[in-house]
Amino acid sequence: MKAAEIREKFLKFFESKGHTIVRSSSLVPGNDPTLLFTNSGMVQFKDVFLGAETRPYSRATTAQRSVRAGGKHNDLENVGYTARHHTFFEMLGNFSFGDYFKRDAIHYAWELLTSVYKLPADKLWVTVYHDDDEAYDIWAKEVGVPAERIIRIGDNKGARYASDNFWQMGDTGPCGPCSEIFYDHGPDVWGGPPGSPEEDGDRYIEIWNLVFMQFNRDAQGNMTRLPKPCVDTGMGLERIAAVLQHVHSNYEIDLFQQLIKASARETGVADLANNSLKVIADHIRACSFLIVDGVIPGNEGRGYVLRRIVRRAIRHGYKLGRKAPFFHKLVADLVAEMGAAYPELKEAEPRVTDVLRQEEERFFETIEHGMSILEAALAELDAAGGKTLDGELAFKLHDTYGFPLDLTADVCRERGVTVDEPAFDDAMARQREQARAAGKFKATQGLEYTGAKTTFHGYEEIAFDDAKVVALYVEGASVGEVKAGESAVVVLDHTPFYAESGGQVGDQGVLANAATRFAVGDTLKVQADVIGHHGELEQGTLKVGDVVRAEIDAARRARTARNHSATHLMHKALRDVLGSHVQQKGSLVDADKTRFDFAHNAPLTDDEIRRVEAIVNEQVLANAPGIVRVMPYDDAVKGGAMALFGEKYGDEVRVLDLGFSRELCGGTHVHRTGDIGLFKIVAEGGVAAGIRRVEAITGDNAVRYVQALDARVNAAAAALKAQPSELLQRIGQVQDQVKSLEKELGALKSKLASSQGDELAQQAVEVGGVHVLAATLDGADAKTLRETVDKLKDKLKSAAIVLAAVDGGKVSLIAGVTADASKKVKAGELVNFVAQQVGGKGGGRSDMAQAGGTEPAKLPAALAGVKGWVEARL
């Protein structure tokens, strides 16, 4: 039975039992920003189990794509070397949300395994939690499993409820016993039943885990029964396929065999049992589906894990002798195997292939040099009998050649060598400390403040009349008063000033009363809810307890708000044009521009930029209102608001609906999209691997930019005596004319070279049967010099020639030697003899070489020495 049929039979079986087939959720969890990847079937139902979400069904079944390759759940090092470890796998599961419980879950599992999959009942063993008599009795008395094949597992991990057969979502919350089903491969395979000293053998393989959530655990560890217990089961598709296809390794099932054959095809390896082929076959699944779900190779978070997996696959191909990109070619084979079950994979095939190709090309640029350094170090270590690689070298490979530490460790592990990771960590820490020392820190760092939080009024007001000074700081120290001319940080009890946050710069403005004026140049957070006003006291004395009018620079705020709102619209437009993988990686919003960094693997084309601009400006013209709502975080995310991975959000969040965009944001924005006026992208480029940056302007800045661009177009048209609408056509005509003139000039230079060649031939001096010529050819370029040397070689038959030309203080040199003379006189050595005397160097073949120099005044003497130099070698 093939893997595709096993998957289909599982889903159809549970559908026949009243379950709703729910499509696999993304590998990037949408409801848990703390989880790196979806690693089990229950992740998408977590809020349902917690009671925070309801679904229109109480029974569900899924085939869930899962990844375990980072953080706590990390199988990467074992992948390819064991029978059952994978980075990517499919988890088949059935779930009950307060509907059926142990009895039905156990009977369903037994019926599927024995009646649908036709597994022999006497090959199946089960485990239960040691005091779960209910589950034990169902297995023994209702299903009929003999007592000798039902094993009670106790608290085998050192504490109450710490057991392989007791599942917990976390330290608190839903939990309960579980029952695992094992398949016995028979006495020919070493190993013992679960709970025995030989349980790690391969004879008894776990194929299904049935989790019974029946308790809630509080912070004190007390267990109370849930009013509506739930069921969460999981069976690895690859494991059950190995059992049903009568093989002992998951890599021998049909799905993997096709991918292993494809890997062998691309690497030129005949031995299909090679572990490196298993690594590559496994990794193409994880990499492809991660890219489908919007992950792009990068240097942090999920992107870094993806990059590690890609590079590990490439490194194993390199180990097999594949020294050129190959990995991306396996995407088509994966689509052939899994595209029917996952149409999103087939749809994304071109993008997945392109992302992997670019990542391969990038890594192959550095891998050869880095590998040669590592191989040399390992050879030296082996000769010395050492078993530990220097951590400083590992850091150099990481820092200079882009080798992740785990890649270096992987290569070392195969040689029985370990990496000195503490030394690596020390080197990394030193680099970070140097980076920190080179940076400039804001003055709010280190301010000791223990007062009340600041009340912010800046969403509604641009000024606050009765703001009280509650703290003052000069050079980081708390003071009671500030005098005119001093720079300080002022903390108020109420303020309309927005503090730098979320990429938006802080406000500028004035704090003043009848006797005092404090110019605010920047606004930063002292603490999460405490705002510091940075600036200089221009007149008077400012004391703690004084009351001032706090007024922001409203025009600057308005320009900043336009740019911030445009950023939201641009983010949505980029996702619409480029794909859902686009995610914000950083931003800077000020009064002049918006700078937006995002995940994407290729430069934006001119057409893509125009489309993004058009979409944003359509939203501007729609003049849609900006609607702000404060709501619980979970409600906001469920309502479609975009939350950024890695950002910390409180229980209550601010949601901004602006046109077609909905994001969590605490910044300041326009009241309507029409207030943006005009949106224009002015720059696009790369800032890191997999990260692009777009800069854009809005409002009057955009108008001035377009006007200046229009003026330049008009000026260019006037210079070419054309109308602006005819400019491109006129430029094309001028380019054609230039090409024609260049062709004529080249012909004239060749003609001139030919005539000069005849004259120069007469200047050649015969030395030992070889004609030696060293001369200057006025006005010649490099091409003319080469052509002249070739003609002189033909004319003189046996010759050693150096020709030079001077242009703008630079010397060009060409040397040519006929074949009969090149055994003793090398053109590369000859041209270097002259070049070194005129401040340059060069090289080439024995019959033709070129060089340059920067000291034309020394050229006559250098050429005069050629005859003697040649004579000495004949």
Swiss-Prot record:
Zn(2+) binds at H564, H568, C665, H669. One of its GO terms (biological process) is negative regulation of DNA-templated transcription. Its cofactor is Zn(2+). Disulfide bonds: none annotated. One of its GO terms (cellular component) is cytosol. Its EC number is 6.1.1.7. Its main location: cytoplasm. It is found in: Cytoplasm. Binds 1 zinc ion per subunit. HAMAP family: Ala_tRNA_synth_B. PANTHER family: ALANINE--TRNA LIGASE, CYTOPLASMIC (PTHR11777:SF9), ALANYL-TRNA SYNTHETASE (PTHR11777). Catalyzes the attachment of alanine to tRNA(Ala) in a two-step reaction: alanine is first activated by ATP to form Ala-AMP and then transferred to the acceptor end of tRNA(Ala). Also edits incorrectly charged Ser-tRNA(Ala) and Gly-tRNA(Ala) via its editing domain. This is Alanine--tRNA ligase. It comes from Burkholderia mallei (strain ATCC 23344).
